[in-house]
Amino acid sequence: DCAALGARALTFQADLSDEAAARALLPAVVQAFGAVDAVVNNASDFEYDDPGSFSYALMERQWRANTAPAIVLAQALHEHLQARGATGCVVNLLDQKLWNQNPDYLSHTLSKAALEAATTMLAMGLAPAVRVCGVAPGVTLLSGAMEDGEFEAAHRMTPLRRSSTPEDIARAVRFLIESPAITGTTLLVDGGQHLQAQPRDVMFLA
């Protein structure tokens, strides 16, 4: 798709739960393209637990997948941009659930809450070379054991009767990358899902 639009696209793989692999990723991209102006932290692990099944092991896996790599990649972009005398942007993909909490997916939610806090702190600490922002989607793709009908029902459980699509999220990310006066804030792109308090994750209510 990117090539059809006249853009050059390459795929890079890394186990982001491994610190050395995470730190090596951006330099590899720079070597291939010559420069990097933005990082979108979209990789995420999504495993179920709740207050009754919480464990150190799962919390650590969620932290190593969802929180720590985003910080390392922001560090790497900052170093690269400073060396170039340039500016750029990091966008962290969060979750509307941070504004509409329930006890499902406890460790995942905690890891995203830490990333939301890191978004603010990184925006302060990496300025002026790097702006750091967040995008918090709602129900966007099938997850877990959801079937198509359940997903469609969950997707409509918002004030706007629609949640986010991948295209909605991409537009929000692009807007933030292209907006040089915005940093340290998060756009909620969820059809208003965060305005509706729910006792459980929406996938269990559809």
Predicted features by range, described:
Residues 23, 45-61, 79, 104-107, ...:
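Conserved mid-core segment of classical short-chain dehydrogenase/reductases
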Residues 35-37, 116, 126-140, 182-189:
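Conserved Rossmann-fold SDR core element
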Residues 37, 45, 52-72, 91, ...:
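Catalytic Tyr-X3-Lys loop
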Residues 82-114, 119-127, 139:
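Catalytic loop of short-chain dehydrogenase/reductase
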